[in-house]
């Protein structure tokens, strides 16, 4: 199916929150003001995927440090000495699943020549998505960040080398 990927804009937030609501159980829903602050903190690394009916997927990311976890519902704190693109939240609306949109969103930020050019990428895999992320070269990685404890059981911190 045809879809486009573009930078996320403030006007997209209502649709982004609808996708979040469709993709996560209540304990994992993040507050609208936190989501909005994240876009303001890292506009260069937050993107949406759109189909003919509008926004149907998104990816929030920001420059961080390897080993650091963003707690659920916490604002982004971009690192001045970043070495890692932290992918905080990737979600695709049920209407658009299985059509390569998640792959396109990830490739948009991690594909060759993309900026910022950081040595690593990392994330917390939730909802049985570790195998999905493994397909992009991510593997379980040690972290002692206390933010991981706030995630549901089964969440896995994963990282990869970007090159
Ligand atoms: C995980 C998610 C983003 C995948 O979206 P999608 O648009 O259906 O994924 P794509 O169509 O781009 O699939 C890309 C590849 O991953 C595979 N894949 C998709 N979901 C998968 C999963 N849960 N486990 C393993 N592989 C998966 C696809 O088969 C495809 O493989 P292929 O290219 O070899 O055919 C989507 O299921 C989702 O939004 N889930 C709810 C939110 C969530 O839990 N996000 C993870 C946050 S860490």
Language-model features: locations:
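Conserved acetyl-CoA-binding loop-helix of GNAT-fold acetyltransferases
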Residues: 92, 98-111
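Conserved GNAT acetyl-CoA-binding A-motif
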Residues: 106, 111-126
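Active-site rim helix/loop that mediates acceptor-substrate recognition in acyltransferases
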Residues: 25-52, 56, 60-76
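Helix-loop element at the rim of GNAT/NAT acetyltransferase active sites that forms part
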Residues: 7, 18-31
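C-terminal "cap" of GNAT-fold acetyltransferases
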Residues: 9, 79, 126-127, 136, ...
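A short beta-loop-alpha structural element at the N-terminal edge
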Residues: 2-16
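Conserved acyl-donor/pantetheine-binding loop and adjacent beta-alpha core of acyl/acetyltransferases
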Residues: 58-91, 97, 144-154
């Amino acid at each position: 199916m045809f879809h486009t990927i573009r930078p996320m804009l403030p006007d997209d937030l209502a649709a982004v929150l609808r996708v979040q609501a469709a993709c996560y159980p209540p304990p994992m829903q993040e507050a609208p003001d936190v989501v909005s602050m994240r876009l303001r903190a890292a506009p260069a690394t937050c993107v949406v995927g759109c189909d003919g009916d509008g926004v149907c997927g998104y990816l929030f990311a920001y420059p961080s440090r390897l080993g650091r976890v963003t707690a659920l519902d916490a604002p982004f704190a971009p690192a001045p000495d970043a070495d890692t693109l932290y992918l905080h939240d990737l979600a695709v609306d049920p209407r658009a699943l299985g059509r390569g949109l998640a792959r396109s969103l990830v490739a948009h930020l991690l594909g060759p020549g993309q900026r910022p050019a950081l040595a690593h990428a990392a994330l917390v895999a939730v909802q049985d998505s570790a195998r999905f992320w493994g397909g992009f070269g991510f593997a379980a990685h040690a972290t002692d960040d206390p933010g991981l404890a706030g995630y549901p059981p089964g969440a896995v911190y994963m990282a990869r080398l970007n090159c």
